[in-house]
A protein has these predicted regions:
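Periplasmic OmpA-like peptidoglycan-binding domain that tethers envelope proteins to the cell wall
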Residues: 38, 44-49, 53-56, 60, ...
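Periplasmic peptidoglycan-binding/tethering modules of Gram-negative envelope proteins
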Residues: 1-72, 161-178
Length: 178
């Protein structure tokens, strides 16, 4: 199991981040940040009132020994509601990608994460965390649908330990063949 205990402890000790969710598997830690916490509805600019909090949080993450050297994928996700014709962005693909880019840029420029560790992806509504269908196969409605949409609007930080060969290459680069 990937060691995510330091992040888990930090989340428990800091109620400001109680809406963040952490899941660990054998090879990675997935930290889910709700879009409602980070961005205004339909926007890709981090809310001014939480930017410093987010920087502090990401600084804590950056300094966790258990994540040292990990590759980090920043994934943006939206709900299944199409953007209006008057929206700032063309569609949920663009919005999800820009949200991931915004968080990754903050991580690199303000918090000091190394760019070579970070990759960015936008998935629109194609990878829901909470399904839009109920147990009986019918589409959710009412509060169940609203809760599914809320859960699916998120940015995920996925920390993965590189394969042994990649870690070795980083410490012992191959000589130039030329």
């Amino acid at each position: 199991m990937k060691d995510c205990s330091g992040i888990n402890r930090f989340l428990r000790e800091n109620p400001a981040f109680s809406s963040f969710e952490l899941n660990a598997s054998k090879s990675r830690c997935i930290l889910s940040l709700p879009s409602g916490f980070l961005f205004p509805s339909g926007g890709a600019t981090i809310k001014t009132e939480i930017e410093q909090q987010l920087e502090n949080f990401l600084g804590e993450i950056r300094d966790r020994y258990e994540l040292e050297g990990d590759a980090i994928r920043v994934d943006g996700h939206t709900d299944d509601v199409p953007l209006s014709k008057n929206a700032r962005y063309r569609n949920n693909w663009e919005l999800s990608t820009l949200r991931a880019t915004t968080v990754a840029t903050l991580m690199m420029e303000k918090v000091g994460f190394k760019p070579e560790r970070i990759a960015i992806s936008g998935y629109a509504d194609t990878r829901p965390k909470t399904p839009y269908l109920g147990n009986d196969g019918s589409r959710k409605s009412g509060i169940d649908l609203l809760n599914a949409r809320k859960a699916n609007r998120r940015v995920e930080l996925i920390f993965t330990r590189p394969a042994q060969k990649e870690r070795t290459r980083r410490f012992f680069p191959e000589p130039n063949a030329g």
